[in-house]
Amino acid sequence: MTDDEKREILKEFDPFSQLEQANGNPDKDVKFKKDDPNRAAAEETNRDISAQDKGDEEPFYDFQIFIKQLQTPGADPLVKYTKSFLRNFLAQRLLWTVSEEIKLISDFKTFIYDKFTLYEPFRSLDNSKMRNAKEGMEKLIMGKLYSRCFSPSLYEILQKPLDDEHMKDLTNDDTLLEKIRHYRFISPIMLDIPDTMPNARLNKFVHLASKELGKINRFKSPRDKMVCVLNASKVIFGLLKHTKLEQNGADSFIPVLIYCILKGQVRYLVSNVNYIERFRSPDFIRGEEEYYLSSLQAALNFIMNLTERSLTIEDHEDFEEAYQRNFKQLAEEKEEEEKKKQLEIPDELQPNGTLLKPLDEVTNIVISKFNELFSPIGEPTQEEALKSEQSNKEEDVSSLIKKIEENERKDTLNTLQNMFPDMDPSLIEDVCIAKKSRIGPCVDALLSLSE
């Protein structure tokens, strides 16, 4: 994928102009020496990572490398800028409108990306590593601001009406979920999906795609949520590839996507899509990502307006009977849910039992390390006393990250083996290793091998 490095830099807005006037502009008189350790760190990063870019379908991305770069002495001004922005965003108001959030965050990203060109180690990064730094900054700030920008979480925290745009997210989420529940019983043929494979095989692909899409609520950053959309779309494309329907484009893709959404019953999809569109940098949504995101939006719009007339129905009497059976089942499920709620012990952190708690453990761990940069600097003697404890913490973090990544690798391998049951498991594992367990590139490679 080719990066578009011609970024339009807006100069009229500088969110920290007052800070610079008060403290002196740290951008002035910045000198860079050939033996600067910060520059050396950047050059080492470029060398170590360059091999990973060759032959890779996706731009290089490593959030931990970005955090390490941000912890170098030369990046101190960037840390101060980021700390100031986050503190002001969180402290000045409990509720920003969606439009205000978009402008504030977009303006800050433009500002801080411009500052990357002034400070080491970022100043010496090549294009792909600079993109990684920008991706990392987006992930960092949105991880910190998630509960204020993601409508369901914001509403759960404030427990009061929000601005019109945030409330519209919640209303559309409810509308979508209601439609999904009412029409979850429909068959593929009602969506004009050709009957070209056994239902068991179709359901397997649909389950896998729904599972990948369902992971969207586990993550906080727009990029990670977008990856969930991309992975689900790759699974659907795999289904179309096996049934020789991929040449039909959106005419085949969107109906299958609709079917996956109806069967998966993933919550907060409207809010998630809007969150991606609002806070993912436009330069990062290109090509297939833009296509798949637009397709998901089209599928959601179709479902929210879904009626019996939207479907291809051969026997309306049978359809009505199935609809009524499902309606009765929904009533029974609701009654069971009410009984369970009465038996549950209230959770102070989850007043209504619906607050999303993203499970992006690796990101949360690394962000917690970044929080240390925001803490006041202690006396030298105190720092020395904490060295041993800090070293142990870093070892624990590294160990936990490796454990989480290994579990994800195993889960991806199992998913791929279910998708391609006729393929040699050792070959699937080799592809999984080569593609770093990213299900999108893995599916692409395995589809090519299965031709």
UniProtKB/Swiss-Prot annotation:
Role according to the record: Required for vacuolar protein sorting; may be required for the consumption of transport vesicles containing vacuolar protein precursors. May bind a Rab GTPase such as VPS21.
Q: Which GO terms describe its biological process?
A: Golgi to endosome transport; late endosome to vacuole transport via multivesicular body sorting pathway; protein localization to endosome; protein targeting to vacuole; vacuole inheritance
Q: Where in the sequence is Phosphoserine found?
A: S375
What stretch of residues is annotated with the motif GBH motif II? Answer: 249-257
Matches recorded under SMART domains? CUE, VPS9
Give Gene Ontology CC terms: cytosol; early endosome; endocytic vesicle
Query: Which SUPFAM superfamilies does the record cross-reference, listed alphabetically?
Result: UBA-like, VPS9 domain
**Primary residence:** cytoplasm
Q: Where is the VPS9 domain?
A: 170-312
Location comes to: Cytoplasm
Which residue intervals define the domain CUE in the entry? 408-451
Its domain of life reads: Eukaryota
This chain's protein is named Vacuolar protein sorting-associated protein 9
